[in-house]
Amino acid sequence: GDLSLDSIERLDIHVGATVSDRVVAEIASETQALKTYDRAVGLLATRARASRELERLLVRKGEPPALAKAAVARLAAQGFLDDASFAKQFARTKLALGLSRRRMQTELARRGVDRGTADAAIDEVVVDDGVDEADACDRVAARKFRSLKDLPSDVQRRRLYAFLARRGYEADDVRAVVDRLVGRS
């Protein structure tokens, strides 16, 4: 397996040296840790992830939990993993797609971002982008309503309500928007 230069120096491995059973065990351990770290880097290279999300994914892919935790800690210490930055990026992207604050909180929690970090990130993005949740609900509904215009009004109402509810908008906002777009029946 592969061994980092740091490990080779720390274990005092050099050509012609006698390697004890203890050193062989340490080499195996270091090799596994490096493999787990490399896998974590690869997963992080495909897309940004939250710390807990990455740790769970590594374990699900068969990495030992202790090594997954160590790899995540190392990446965080190196500045490659930052839940606050991830949450802001996630919130900005999802806000543009029309997700509500509540739905973003749920999605971030599912990815392992703690509630305080998620709320702070969402608040910052909402303030920076000047988003009003009722207006966002209205915009998303209007866009969706265009695809429903040929359907009977009861079907429009049901589908639009379900669509907005899945995005996590407040029931009062959803009801008002649906009533305005579909008309009261």
Model-derived segments and spans:
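An alpha-helical, amphipathic repeat domain used for nucleic-acid recognition
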Residues: 1-185
